[in-house]
């Protein structure tokens, strides 16, 4: 990914929505496919999906499942490292930029 592609992706991050899944099995399959694709849009969808699930489970007084933790860690590692390299900034700065643009 070039620097220009990375900057363009950050500016479109807000318009990328979480995956819409009817069943837990479907969510799991969609997350696996998104991570396997390594496409920035798909990775951000996985991250947003798991973040929504984290909020939902917190409202129920539950923790995030290990599988969901695994999905978000993988997606964040791939996406944040790719953007950090492309933009020549640290991973922490990438996380801050994603949060600023995606919210």
Regions found by a protein language model. Give the residues of each.
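Charge/polar-rich, low-complexity and marginally structured segments
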Residues: 1-103
